[in-house]
Amino acid sequence: VVSMGQTNNDSDKVDEALQKVWMHELADRRIGDLSGGQQQRVFIAKALVNSPKILVLDEPVTGVDVHNKDLFFQILSELNSKEKISVIWSSHDLDAVERLANKVACLNKTLFFHGISQEFFNDEEMMKKYSETSMQMHMHHH
């Protein structure tokens, strides 16, 4: 599923990318036969083949079941910590953002907060402003 458009020389990169997102065992399956969460992991693997320094994801777990959602976030955390890949993603899931974010950017037509995740979650005024906003989570490797 990831190797589309890649040469034979890239097969090792494809295998490595699939292992990083825990999809190696399903490498021979068609993308349409995979669950939504599995498909998201394949899309991440496809990006990993090119050795990115940053992944930018828009609501990556929308419609994904709870098990695959947790697995997806665990994979993103590992990519951040082990592979030194910065991950920026948009989310309205405050629980996930609070558990995983190093930094938070909160937008509601303008940027009204950008800083350390815990500062945001400890600020009652910020939490009130959050309603009807778009939040972006950042996992930076420093």
Q: What positions do the PLM features span?
A:
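Conserved ABC ATPase "signature" region
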Residues: 9-26
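Conserved ABC ATPase signature
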Residues: 30-34, 38
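Conserved catalytic motifs of ABC-family nucleotide-binding domains
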Residues: 51
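Catalytic Walker B motif of ABC-type/P-loop ATPase nucleotide-binding domains
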Residues: 55-58
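H-loop/switch region of ABC-family ATPase nucleotide-binding domains
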Residues: 91-92
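A short, surface-exposed alpha-helical micro-motif characterized by mixed small hydrophobic
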Residues: 97-99
